[in-house]
Amino acid sequence: VLYNLFSRGIERDVLPTCTRYGIGVMTYGPLNGGWLTGKYRRDEPAPDDSRAVRLGAVQGNRWDPERAANRTKLDLLDRLRELATTAGLPMTHLAHAWAAEHPAVSSVIIGPRTPAQLDDAIASADVTLDHDLLDALDELVPPGTDIDTVDTTRPEPQLSRRVRRRPR
């Protein structure tokens, strides 16, 4: 299930339910499609190797910095960079460590695209965030908050007409 600092909706129902019944949760997307790497900045073009450039034409305005949700992300990223710098962490390490912090999360799928991204993700495996930093992150993005519903909305094949109706 998707879980990262910008997509925290599962904290409302999925994670508490899994905790109650002793079920471990495998999450993915700890970098929110690259947003939490720190590479996206206000008034700067997206890097050439970024998902925004590679998939921008296919995914429409999802990466448009003028979208309201993306403006919110850019505002939050300014503060997240400050918190990461104060903690002496790269943004990616902060994001990976945060995603693994919830007690119901048993595993975080990292999804690197390059060997350098893999090395960076491996280096973040031993990072532990202190309670003050976790509290600051909760203040910034309150528990249970989804910044952008586009991130958490996926086609649900089980709701398609083909699956819900008998063949005629």
Q: At which residue positions do the language-model features occur?
A:
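Alpha-amylase-like alpha-glycosidases and glucanotransferases acting on alpha-linked glucans and related
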Residues: L2, T19-Y21, H102
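Active-site PLP-lysine loop of aminotransferase-like
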Residues: L2-G9, G29-L31, A97
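Conserved active-site loop/cleft motifs that coordinate metal ions or position small ligands
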Residues: T92-A95, S107-G111
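Conserved, mostly hydrophobic/aromatic
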Residues: C18, V25-Y28, L80, L94-A95, ...
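Terminal-tail/helix-coil boundary detector
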Residues: D43-T86, E101-S106, P115, D119-R168
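Positions that flank functional sites
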Residues: N32-G33, A99, T114
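Aromatic-lined glycan-binding groove of carbohydrate-active enzymes
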Residues: I10-L55, P90
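Hydrophobic faces of well-ordered beta-strands that scaffold small-molecule active sites
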Residues: V1, V25-T27, V108-I110
